[in-house]
């Protein structure tokens, strides 16, 4: 079961704020410029983000510019891994999934695969390398060949990530365990050396 849920919409932040005001729902403007609004309902927080298209990532962490979109496919295309690029149509009563990158199949096969070119995805945000490793250890999944190759040849991208973020991800990797193979031990060893 998910730790949290990400809600995405074609409504702009201004439209979401207006709907919240009309419905007397408390709002926390967490990331308006990135399209994210947090709604507080019955002591629960729900983050809702406008569909987005990203531009270049010149700092290796965040997009230079975020462009809002009205198309869920644009939003899913910017996700890191296929297993995180699945949407459930909340307006449908039939559990209708939007899964353009076969993330459900990758979950069934226990595979971690990037959306699109793995080198490009990791270059956009070096933290994705650590997230991939964390998912591997947490879920007991394996990497597809291209993702694994991109991880092993792009450790230098971690140089752009703060030590605090690296430490946080690394501790989560250790907590989740699943050191089941020589490859797992090699990944941990490589991380420690980096």
Where in this protein do the model-derived segments appear?
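Catalytic cores of the polymerase beta-like nucleotidyltransferase superfamily
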Residues: 1-194
């Amino acid at each position: 079961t998910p730790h949290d849920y990400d809600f995405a919409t074609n409504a702009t932040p201004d439209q979401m704020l207006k709907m919240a005001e009309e419905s007397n729902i408390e709002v926390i403007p967490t990331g308006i410029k990135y399209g994210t609004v947090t709604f507080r309902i019955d002591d629960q927080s729900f983050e809702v983000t406008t569909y987005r298209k990203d531009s270049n990532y010149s700092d290796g962490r965040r997009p230079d510019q975020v462009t809002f979109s009205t198309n869920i496919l644009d939003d899913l295309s910017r996700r890191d891994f296929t297993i995180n690029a699945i949407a459930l149509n909340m307006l449908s009563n039939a559990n209708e999934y939007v899964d353009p990158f076969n993330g459900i199949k990758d979950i069934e096969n226990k595979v971690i695969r990037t959306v699109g070119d793995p080198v490009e995805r990791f270059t956009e945000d070096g933290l994705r390398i650590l997230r991939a490793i964390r998912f591997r250890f947490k879920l007991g999944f394996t990497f597809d060949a291209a993702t694994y190759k991109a991880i092993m040849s792009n450790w230098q991208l971690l140089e752009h990530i703060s030590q605090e973020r690296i430490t946080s991800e690394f501790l989560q990797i250790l907590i989740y365990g699943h050191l089941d193979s020589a490859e797992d031990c090699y990944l941990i060893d490589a991380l420690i050396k980096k």
